[in-house]
Regions:
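Conserved Radical SAM active-site core
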Residues: 1-71, 75-95, 108-112, 120
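Hydrophobic faces of well-ordered beta-strands that scaffold small-molecule active sites
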Residues: 2, 34-36, 57-59, 95-99, ...
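Active-site beta-loop-alpha junctions enriched in small/polar residues
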Residues: 7-9, 37-41, 62-64, 100-104, ...
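Short, small-residue-enriched loops and turns at beta-alpha junctions
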Residues: 8-14, 74, 102-107, 134-139, ...
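Weak global preference for isoleucine
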Residues: 23-26, 34, 82, 89, ...
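Low-complexity, flexible helical/coil segments
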Residues: 35-42, 70-75, 91-100, 131-137, ...
């Protein structure tokens, strides 16, 4: 399968609607599965993308308006992103909201509110990722969030969303792996690219290990 993504325009839209014919052709002529990463996409465009055959939609969600405005620089609020998730669920699409822990320069704060907002929609899947300091950006000198902060958010999500599949996605710092087992214990159902040590520990804890070579939202 593949992840279909891209940069957003000043309004926060990831303009995937222009690729609807190509998506239809891919779905009609290949067995590939498609995960579309959308931003503040209007409902009409979402309808076209759903009808094109997209298998899963990934939507970043946030817990407060300040985080949206500082990090993304758009004139929108947290509820606008939750609204995209709601629209996709209403349209019968598979959707995997994503919460980035520490996205505000490594600082945490919005995440638990984001979990509560997602819990009201009870999606089948919720993905956690975490901030990675990136050279050339405003946050390049900021620290990655602590592992214990990521684990705390996962634990809260497990309590709030007992029937939702919780996954740890690919975008996270791999420098410190010591907290991965704690994340499993907190309630994760799956993890992208776990360390070998984490896999061995999970097996010892009684987890059934299933390897899948695909985007976690499609797994």
């Amino acid at each position: 399968g593949l992840l279909l993504s891209g940069g957003s325009d000043p309004a926060g839209r990831v303009r995937l609607d222009r690729f609807v014919p190509a998506i239809r052709e891919i779905k009609d002529s290949t067995p590939l599965k498609i995960n579309a990463h959308v931003g503040l996409t209007p409902r009409g465009e979402l309808e076209s993308l759903v009808a094109s055959g997209v298998d899963t939609f990934s939507v970043d969600v946030y817990g407060d308006d300040e985080t949206v405005r500082e990090v993304l620089g758009v004139s929108a609020g947290a509820q606008d992103y939750i609204g995209v998730v709601r629209d996709l669920i209403d349209l019968g699409a598979e959707v995997a909201p994503h919460i980035c822990v520490g996205i505000r320069g490594g600082r945490t704060g919005h995440e638990h509110d984001a979990v509560r907002a997602v819990a009201r929609l009870a999606p089948k899947t919720l993905v956690f990722i975490s901030f990675i300091p990136t050279r050339g950006t405003a946050y390049e000198s900021c620290p990655a969030p602590r592992g214990e902060d990521v684990v705390s958010v996962i634990r809260g999500a497990r309590s709030a969303l007992p029937g939702t599949r919780l996954l740890l996605g690919c975008m996270r710092s791999k420098r410190d792996r010591s907290w991965e087992v704690d994340a499993l214990r907190a309630g994760l159902d799956g993890m992208v690219l776990p360390s070998d040590e984490t896999v061995r520990a999970a097996s010892a804890l009684g987890y059934a290990i299933r390897k899948k070579g695909t985007c976690c939202a499609l797994a």
